[in-house]
């Protein structure tokens, strides 16, 4: 089993894939952060910050008196964002923990599900919270990943193969549903959670970028391992570009808890 993050930040379309996810999920993330009552001047950490879209939104929220630490193992998309409010750090959270007791908010989205060391990482994130600080973790649960209208066996076959291929590489497609219990086990209080399945309609020109680009990046491994064949891949891509295809994305489970 791999111990490394599965998806390659150097892949030619990785920024497009990440951007498509930010368009789906950033509004919900910020709505939750506002609900938690993050004040101006707060100290925040965005772990596995990707393109930095949430880090930028946090910087606007906390204002010039606040601080946002944006970390990732590859900071090519983050480096241009560094300024007086946003500090960019190349950091592997599985090896280097955040400073203890420093942050009013720590946020990680679509990260822990990929890490075999997820329980240890979650515990270290909890240690990074200042008293009263919030930890917000958001990951996908694949319970709705094969919901498509009109029904499509090949779409379901490729989606299932993708899920199980990633599982074989250390990904946990059911981790998100355990997050509330994991947050409580980390010694945090005021645990809460919500689950949302976003409906996505196919686009003839763009397809369904979050899922089409995920499968495209994983395609070499899927094909080489016999998880799917070229006919499956071509049919999946065609379905993603049929204008009458409507899917429900995997459940985004957002869980939060506070350090007393």
Where would I find each of the regions flagged by the language model?
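Class I SAM-dependent methyltransferase Rossmann-like catalytic core
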Residues: 3-26
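Conserved alpha-helix/loop element of class I SAM-dependent methyltransferases that forms part
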Residues: 23-40, 57
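Class I SAM-dependent methyltransferase SAM/SAH-binding core
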Residues: 45-96
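A short acidic, Gly/Pro-enriched loop at the edge of an enzyme's catalytic core
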Residues: 96-105
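A short SAM/SAH-binding and catalytic strip from SAM-dependent methyltransferases
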Residues: 104-118
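A short glycine-rich, Lys/Arg-flanked "PGG" loop and its adjoining helix->strand segment in the class I
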Residues: 119-134
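Conserved catalytic/acceptor-binding region of the Class I
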Residues: 136-204
């Amino acid at each position: 089993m791999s111990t490394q993050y599965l998806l390659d930040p150097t892949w030619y379309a990785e920024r497009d894939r990440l951007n498509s996810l930010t368009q789906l999920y950033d509004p919900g993330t910020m709505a939750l952060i506002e609900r938690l009552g993050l004040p101006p001047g707060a100290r925040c950490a965005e772990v596995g910050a990707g393109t930095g879209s949430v880090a930028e939104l946090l910087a606007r929220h906390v204002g010039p008196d606040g601080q946002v630490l944006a970390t990732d193992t590859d900071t090519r998309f983050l480096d241009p964002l560094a300024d007086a409010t946003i500090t960019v750090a190349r950091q592997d959270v599985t090896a280097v923990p955040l400073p203890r007791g420093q942050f009013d908010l720590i946020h990680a989205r679509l990260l822990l599900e990929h890490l075999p060391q997820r329980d240890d990482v979650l515990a270290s994130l909890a240690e990074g919270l200042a008293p009263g600080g919030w930890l917000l973790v958001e990951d996908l649960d694949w319970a709705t990943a094969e919901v498509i209208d009109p029904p499509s066996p090949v779409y379901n076959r490729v989606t299932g193969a993708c899920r199980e291929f990633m599982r074989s590489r250390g990904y946990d497609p059911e981790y998100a549903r355990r997050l509330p219990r994991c947050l409580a086990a980390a010694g945090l209080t005021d645990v809460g959670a919500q689950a949302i399945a976003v409906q996505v309609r196919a686009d003839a020109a763009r397809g369904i970028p979050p899922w089409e680009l995920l499968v495209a990046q994983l395609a070499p491994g899927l094909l080489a391992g016999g998880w799917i064949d070229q006919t499956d891949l071509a049919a999946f891509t065609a379905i993603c570009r049929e204008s009458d295809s409507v899917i429900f994305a995997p459940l985004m489970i957002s869980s939060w808890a506070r350090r007393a």
